């Protein structure tokens, strides 16, 4: 049974979050949680939270055994960017893009 968890509008760029997502794709959830715990990236904490939510969803909604679960799919899509302005010299301004992303984790017991 496939179970999904999402974190939409996560305040990290999709490019940075994909580096972390690639580490755990296809792994058993216990190994994936271990990897994320010791990965020194901001995105690792965000992905770990989504993975824990997917595990809880599988256990509560589908009655799945945690020991059999694997991360079958994990993908990170770009969310909307917040546009901000940074003042510069001589009355100019630069535009800053505060990027967001949508993190999706799918766990399955098959």
From Swiss-Prot:
GO biological process annotations for this chain's record?
translation
- InterPro entries associated with the record: Ribosomal_uL22, Ribosomal_uL22_bac/chlpt-type, Ribosomal_uL22_bac/org-type, Ribosomal_uL22_CS, Ribosomal_uL22_sf
Its keywords, alphabetically, are: Ribonucleoprotein, Ribosomal protein, RNA-binding, rRNA-binding
> Can you name one GO molecular function term for this protein?
rRNA binding
Instruction: Name a single GO cellular component.
Output: cytosolic large ribosomal subunit
What this protein is reported to do is described as: This protein binds specifically to 23S rRNA; its binding is stimulated by other ribosomal proteins, e.g. L4, L17, and L20. It is important during the early stages of 50S assembly. It makes multiple contacts with different domains of the 23S rRNA in the assembled 50S subunit and ribosome.
- Tell me which NCBIfam families the record gives: rplV_bact
Q: How does it assemble?
A: Part of the 50S ribosomal subunit.
* PANTHER family reported in the protein's UniProt record: CHLOROPLAST 50S RIBOSOMAL PROTEIN L22-RELATED, LARGE RIBOSOMAL SUBUNIT PROTEIN UL22M
Which family would the database say this protein is a member of? Answer: Belongs to the universal ribosomal protein uL22 family.
User: What is this protein identified as?
Assistant: Large ribosomal subunit protein uL22
């Amino acid at each position: 049974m496939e179970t999904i968890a999402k974190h939409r509008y996560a305040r990290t760029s999709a490019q940075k979050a994909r580096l972390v997502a690639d580490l755990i794709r296809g792994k058993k959830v216990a190994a994936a949680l271990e990897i994320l715990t010791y990965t020194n990236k901001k995105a690792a904490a965000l992905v770990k939270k989504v993975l824990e939510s997917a595990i809880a969803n599988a256990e509560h909604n589908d009655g799945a055994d945690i020991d059999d679960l694997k991360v079958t799919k994990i993908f990170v899509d770009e969310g909307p960017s917040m546009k901000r302005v940074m003042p510069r010299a001589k009355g100019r301004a630069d535009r800053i893009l505060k990027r967001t992303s949508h993190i999706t984790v799918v766990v399955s017991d098959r």
